[in-house]
């Protein structure tokens, strides 16, 4: 628990005791006391509507109740500097800012752990994201999903959740057959032999490279073997080639996974039919027109869904159900699936399947990643300058940089369409959101280096009571909010709240820097306190950027 949270608890307890004294209630009769941070700091550090909540019980107007509570609040409390009544009965609190300086040694001590909490209480979450077919490059939707998924996992972990990241490899569908046929055709081509290219094949340069690799590895060994043998071998190589490429691109994007789960393993380990039997045992399976159906309309889906077609082949829904059953059987409390915008209509049937399996539908959450449109100099960009084809994740990183790509994708709620301004992302000005935040970190690093060159080290025992200017207190207040913001971002599944916070923190630092001299050799004690203060800002900026997979540069 951080200093800010401790003070909130103290303040809530003080309000409760004031209500007991002023209104004559027992402690157990006092309703939950809610504290809000006013948008305008002129209205105090915190505000509560407890007087409104008590109006019915006390049979008085809220303002009259507030007037009876305020004198009790002013008694014997060093935390509160001033209390006032606003509007119909809101009670606004102005705290004694001295408590804020207690934050500095705490942040200096916690360092990389600053922002951690037990908010999640160790609840086990699995986040499955990206899960692109292993048949080509990652596109912009995948990139946005990767940035959101990885940032969310980082945030939830810091907030005290037990988080596992998973990539589901779609390696059992018809698209893999097309991949193998494409690789086979390019293999023959690399050997100088004629081969008909499949109508639905993959024509990318990577498949040409794969064909050359196969020719170099095997020579003409598989020219005259049976198709079954050749394609069985090429399937392994093609999947290894494509998944290796995906892994490399994602690692470059600073995204890693705890588990790469193969769809094929569901069949190899006999996980699909037991899932079907469980649905049947629970009474939600029926046969009609030679097909096997799941009665998802029992769970508010708009129509029932086919699991096995009349020709005996599975729909993609059945292995998806088996996969989600497997995830739940691994002991996760909640599953978070991050899907592309084209999967929005798939949510009701998947939640219905979860319930039909005997689990709560609340154990599945789905975050939808909306479309990304690229713009440069106000003009929409549809094709890569380098390849003349659709822009890939790799293209975007090469164009604007890794940090800007990660940060910009985290700036907006995932369920909103995004216009990605490449010109802004490349800008080295304060108009560029990631540059603005990184520059604050770099500037602090520069000041700390200058202080060190003059023999001034950051120390926890500096006299923090010397921090008394409004800009210093404002910076401290923002610093103290970090753990709460992380917990809120985790609870709301909203990485963009971290972006908003980092912008606020950078702004608070820049205001402080513009109005206070940090290195003042004529006032060493104040200098030491301010060095400690900016070090805490540096730590918090770094921790926040790390959550988003963005670097915190020492120099810019």
From Swiss-Prot:
It catalyses: tRNA(Arg) + L-arginine + ATP = L-arginyl-tRNA(Arg) + AMP + diphosphate. A motif ('HIGH' region) lies at residues 132-142. InterPro entries: aa-tRNA-synth_I_CS (IPR001412), Arg-tRNA-ligase (IPR001278), Arg-tRNA-synth_N (IPR005148), Arg-tRNA-synth_N_sf (IPR036695), ArgRS_core (IPR035684), DALR_anticod-bd (IPR008909), Rossmann-like_a/b/a_fold (IPR014729), tRNAsynth_Ia_anticodon-bd (IPR009080). The keyword Cytoplasm applies. Signal peptide: none annotated. Its EC number is 6.1.1.19. Belongs to the class-I aminoacyl-tRNA synthetase family. NCBIfam families: argS (TIGR00456). PANTHER family: ARGININE--TRNA LIGASE, CYTOPLASMIC (PTHR11956:SF5), ARGINYL-TRNA SYNTHETASE (PTHR11956). Monomer. This is Arginine--tRNA ligase.
């Amino acid at each position: 628990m951080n200093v800010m949270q401790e003070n909130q608890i103290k303040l809530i307890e003080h309000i409760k005791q004031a209500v007991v004294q002023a209104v004559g209630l027992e402690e157990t009769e006092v309703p939950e006391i809610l504290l809000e941070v006013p948008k305008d700091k002129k209205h105090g550090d915190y505000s509560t509507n407890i007087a409104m909540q008590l109006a019915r019980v006390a049979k008085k107007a809220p303002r009259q109740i507030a007037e009876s509570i305020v004198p009790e609040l002013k008694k014997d409390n060093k935390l509160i500097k001033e209390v006032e009544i606003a509007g119909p009965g809101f009670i606004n609190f102005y705290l004694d800012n001295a408590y804020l300086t207690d934050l500095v040694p705490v942040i200096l001590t916690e360092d990389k752990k600053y922002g951690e909490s037990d908010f999640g209480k160790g609840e086990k979450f699995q986040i499955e994201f990206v899960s692109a077919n292993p048949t080509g490059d990652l596109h912009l939707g995948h990139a946005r999903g990767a940035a959101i998924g990885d940032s969310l996992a980082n945030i939830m972990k810091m907030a005290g959740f037990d988080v596992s990241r998973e990539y589901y490899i779609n390696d059992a569908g018809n698209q893999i057959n097309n991949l193998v046929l494409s690789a086979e055709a390019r293999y023959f081509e690399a050997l100088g032999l004629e081969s008909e290219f499949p109508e639905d094949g993959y024509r990318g340069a990577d498949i040409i490279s794969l064909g050359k690799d196969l020719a170099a590895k095997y020579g003409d060994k598989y020219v005259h073997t049976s198709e079954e043998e050749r394609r069985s071998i090429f399937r392994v190589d093609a999947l290894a080639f494509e998944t290796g490429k995906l892994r490399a691109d994602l690692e470059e994007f600073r995204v890693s996974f705890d588990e790469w789960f193969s769809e094929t393993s569901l069949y190899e380990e006999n996980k699909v039919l037991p899932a079907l039997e469980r649905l049947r045992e629970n009474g939600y399976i029926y046969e009609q027109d030679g097909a096997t159906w799941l009665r998802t309309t029992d769970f508010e889906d708009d129509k029932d869904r086919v699991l096995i077609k009349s020709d005996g082949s599975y729909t993609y829904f059945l292995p998806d159900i088996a996969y989600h059953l497997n995830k739940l059987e691994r002991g996760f409390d909640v599953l978070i699936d991050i899907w592309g915008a084209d999967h929005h209509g798939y949510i009701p049937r998947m939640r219905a399947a979860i319930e039909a399996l005997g689990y709560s539908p609340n154990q599945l959450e789905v975050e939808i990643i909306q479309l990304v449109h690229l713009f440069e100099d106000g003009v929409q960009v549809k094709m890569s300058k380098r390849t003349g084809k659709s822009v890939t994740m790799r293209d975007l990183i090469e164009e604007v940089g890794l940090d800007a790509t990660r940060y910009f994708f985290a700036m907006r709620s995932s369920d909103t369409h995004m216009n990605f301004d490449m010109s802004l992302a490349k800008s080295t000005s304060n108009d560029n959101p990631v540059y603005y935040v990184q520059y604050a970190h770099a500037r602090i690093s520069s000041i700390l280096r200058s202080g060190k060159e003059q023999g001034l080290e950051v120390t926890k025992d500096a006299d923090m009571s010397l921090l008394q200017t409004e800009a210093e207190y404002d910076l401290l207040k923002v610093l103290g909010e970090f753990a709460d913001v992380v917990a809120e971002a985790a609870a709301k599944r909203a990485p963009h709240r971290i972006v908003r916070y980092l912008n606020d923190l950078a702004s608070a630092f820049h205001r402080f820097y513009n109005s206070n001299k940090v290195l003042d050799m004529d006032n060493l004690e104040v200098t030491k306190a301010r060095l400690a203060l900016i070090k805490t800002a540096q730590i918090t900026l770094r921790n926040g950027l790390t959550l988003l997979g963005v670097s915190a540069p020492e120099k810019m």
